[in-house]
C-alpha cells in the first residue's frame, strides 16, 4: 500500500480509495528510512472494512525485515473474513511457530460496517483506537488487550464493540506518535493525543497531518490510520474525552 521509496523520503501522507463511503487516510514515517510499522486494509464483499495496524519490535532495517512475511499473513487472515480477535489469535500462533523466536509484534485490528457504524476491535498489546467525534470532541476507547503477538501460543484476544455516529473518525496510531524518540519537547502521550485530535480539522487527511506535525521531528517508526464514516445517524459511547477548544 505504501511505496517503500516514499517511506525513505520521510513522513508521507497516503491517500487511499474511498471504500464503502469511508474516507481513509494514513501518514507513516519509518525510522532510518525503513520501518517496522505496517498496516493493511481490506474491503469485504458485504461492504465491511477490516484493518490491522502493527508495530514490529525494534526500529529501522532490523524491524523491517519480517514485515513482508507478516503482511502476507495479515492479508490472508483479513481476507478470510475472521473476526478481529480471531485474526490476532491466528497471527500469534503463526509467529510463535515461525523461525524468528525473538520476533514479537503489537497490533490492533478492527472491522467496521460503514452503513450501521458498528465497529469490532481487538488489541494485542497495542493502543486501542481513538475516536474523533463529528462534534470535534475526542475519545479514547479503553479496550481490553491480549499479549503481544509472538510471545506464547494459544492466546485469546477479546473484542470490544462500539457504535459510531455519522462522520465520526476512528484513529489508529503506533507508539511513535504518543512516545516519539525525536527532539520533540516532550512525549505526546494519550492525553496529548486526545487534545490534538480535538483541535484537528475533521477531514481524515487533516487528522493525520496534525498528529505527525505535533510529534515532528521523529526518530521512531510512527503511523496514523484514520477511517471516517459517512453522514448517518448513530452514536458512540465515550470512555475518556477531550473537548475541542
Task: Enumerate the predicted regions with their spans.
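… and, occasionally, acidic/histidine-rich disordered N-termini of signaling adaptors
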Residues: 1-170, 216-245
Amino acid at each position: 500500500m505504501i511505496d517503500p521509496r516514499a517511506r525513505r523520503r520521510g513522513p508521507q501522507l497516503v491517500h487511499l480509495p474511498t471504500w464503502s463511503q469511508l474516507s481513509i487516510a494514513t501518514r507513516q514515517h519509518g525510522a532510518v528510512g525503513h520501518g517496522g510499522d505496517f498496516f493493511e486494509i481490506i474491503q469485504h464483499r458485504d461492504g465491511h472494512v477490516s484493518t490491522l495496524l502493527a508495530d514490529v519490535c525494534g526500529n529501522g532495517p532490523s524491524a523491517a525485515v519480517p514485515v513482508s512475511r507478516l503482511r502476507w499473513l495479515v492479508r490472508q487472515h483479513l481476507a478470510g473474513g475472521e473476526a478481529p480477535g480471531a485474526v490476532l489469535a491466528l497471527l500469534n500462533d503463526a509467529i510463535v511457530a515461525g523461525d524468528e523466536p525473538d520476533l514479537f509484534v503489537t497490533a490492533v485490528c478492527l472491522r467496521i460496517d460503514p452503513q450501521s457504524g458498528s465497529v469490532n476491535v481487538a488489541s494485542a498489546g497495542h493502543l486501542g483506537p481513538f475516536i474523533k467525534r463529528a462534534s470535534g470532541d475526542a475519545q479514547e476507547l479503553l479496550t481490553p488487550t491480549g499479549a503481544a503477538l509472538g510471545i506464547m501460543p494459544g492466546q485469546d484476544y477479546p473484542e470490544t464493540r462500539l457504535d459510531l455516529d455519522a462522520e465520526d473518525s476512528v484513529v489508529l496510531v503506533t507508539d511513535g506518535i504518543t512516545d516519539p524518540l525525536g527532539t520533540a519537547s516532550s512525549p505526546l502521550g494519550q492525553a496529548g493525543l486526545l487534545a490534538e485530535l480535538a483541535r484537528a480539522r475533521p477531514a481524515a487527511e487533516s487528522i493525520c497531518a496534525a498528529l505527525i506535525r505535533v510529534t515532528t521531528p521523529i526518530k521512531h517508526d510512527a503511523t496514523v490510520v484514520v477511517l471516517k464514516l459517512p453522514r448517518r445517524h448513530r452514536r458512540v459511547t465515550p470512555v475518556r474525552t477531550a473537548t475541542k477548544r
